[in-house]
Amino acid sequence: MWQIYSDDNGATWSDPIPTPMLGFPPHLLTLSDGRLLCSYGRRAAPFGQRVMISEDGITWNHASEITLRDDAPNHDLGYPVSIETQPGEILTFYYQKPAWNPDNKHDHTTAIYQTRWQLSDFE
């Protein structure tokens, strides 16, 4: 995942900067304490849902990656949305598909999941 930023309300933009986040698509949430949370689907093994938190929205530390789930059977997952239901309590919604079934190529079963978690569990 790459990021760009603007210091002038979008009139100009920085060059793209790589982040340590290996996934997409991202969803950004400003937490009640001012930090920025990015939730995303990891579409490479181990497949699942991840989160990173940044103090400033510019620097991201891979060591701070939080694994919400790593049990997805394939890369068809993601589109997370996170909300802070109260300070420090996060609810993240996303979709995952079941494992590919070669006997039923038209099986498009999809499930919407949620993970309720506490920031304090990872700090």
Model-derived regions: residue spans:
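Asp-box/BNR beta-propeller blade signature and adjacent active/binding-site loops
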Residues: 1-123
